[in-house]
Amino acid sequence: MSELCYIISGTGYTRCHSSFYQDNAVEKEKLNDIFKKVNQLTNHKFGALYNACTESNFGKRLMEFDAFSTIHADSGGLQIVTQGAEITEKLKNDVYHNQAKYSNLGMCFDEIPVTVADGRSSRNDTSGRIFDKDNFHVYAENTGKNLLDQINVFDK
């Protein structure tokens, strides 16, 4: 029989990162017990996802709950791009180090071969996005470089 792993996103809504749980061992254990109970209900594991860029303090706090089978860390690239901000080498490096330290699985900064008409786009709005087929290979090579950089940080 297959074993599934359910990864919760939006971990901020669990409030497990809040001072209420971080400063109160009894309440923290109660929350951990709730997470453990979920693991016992069906044939699946229970993991968590956080954004290593915008929620950089979540990974450390999620690791304190032993009920999570795995912790996944998103790069935050889409959120950065949709806000019209720039993804710098320093930002990527900071994210990679956070992922390596606090997660079991880190998602990379993938270069998406899309240009945005006005330089900014909401996450779900695709009306102003244009596929950049002429530079597809450049985006692919940049993604490969990002993966190599991430792997090198994880291997340290």
Label every model-predicted segment.
Residues 1-155:
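Non-catalytic, usually N-terminal nucleic-acid engagement modules in DNA/RNA processing proteins
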